């Protein structure tokens, strides 16, 4: 019997342009949740579960921000501090429109995981509150800060990318005009 091939854009890691990056991204995204949910089955040491979950969340934050975002959807962000004024602002980077074709499967996995994980942590915070397990709330709060930061940053980065692509095509008559449009849009989103 023949196996049906998945359609492009479906949630099958086999269709990914970067399967190792995608699987590592999904492993980081799910591992912190799994350790939080099932850690007590393997050890009674709450501190150990807390530390492992924090390390996995930090690894997820770093991997998503610096590797998975760039390889899967062509987006990257970082925070810069002006040394003179001390003002902080986010900087967004996206791949050039003609240089990278974003795989629909990679994009669906990326955006689904980016928005689903903070929602799951909110549910876990509510469960911790109603089950009166307040000891877990600091861990959930840290998880929410890290996952929501990445979600907001990548959402803004995607909006910046779309706006600069529109501005770039409108002013594509010359490289200077495209750079001016990109810088204007970048300044608008960095406020």
UniProtKB/Swiss-Prot annotation:
It is found in: Golgi apparatus membrane. The chain crosses the membrane at residues 20-40, 46-64, 109-129, 134-154. Glycans are attached at residue 103. One of its GO terms (biological process) is vesicle-mediated transport. One of its GO terms (cellular component) is Golgi membrane. Its main location: Golgi. It is a multi-pass membrane protein. Keywords: Glycoprotein, Golgi apparatus, Membrane, Transmembrane, Transmembrane helix. It comes from the Eukaryota. Pfam families: DUF846. Golgi membrane protein involved in vesicular trafficking. Belongs to the TVP23 family. This is Golgi apparatus membrane protein tvp23. It comes from Neurospora crassa (strain ATCC 24698 / 74-OR23-1A / CBS 708.71 / DSM 1257 / FGSC 987).
């Amino acid at each position: 019997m023949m196996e049906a091939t998945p359609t492009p854009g479906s949630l099958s890691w086999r269709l990914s342009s970067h399967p190792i990056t995608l699987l590592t991204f999904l492993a980081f995204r799910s591992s912190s949740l799994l350790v939080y949910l099932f850690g007590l089955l393997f050890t009674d040491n709450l501190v150990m579960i807390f530390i492992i979950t924090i390390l996995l969340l930090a690894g997820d934050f770093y991997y998503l921000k610096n590797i998975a975002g760039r390889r899967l959807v062509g987006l990257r962000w970082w925070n810069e501090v002006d040394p003179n004024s001390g003002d902080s602002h986010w900087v967004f980077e996206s791949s050039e429109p003609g240089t990278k074709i974003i795989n629909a499967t990679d994009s669906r996995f990326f955006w689904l995981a980016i928005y689903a994980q903070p929602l799951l942590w909110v549910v876990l915070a509510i469960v911790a509150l109603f089950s009166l397990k307040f000891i877990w709330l600091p861990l959930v709060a840290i998880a929410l800060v890290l996952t929501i930061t990445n979600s907001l940053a990548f959402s803004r980065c995607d909006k910046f990318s779309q706006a600069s692509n529109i501005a770039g095509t409108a002013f594509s008559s010359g490289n200077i005009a495209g750079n001016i449009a990109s810088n204007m849009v970048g300044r608008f989103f960095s406020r």
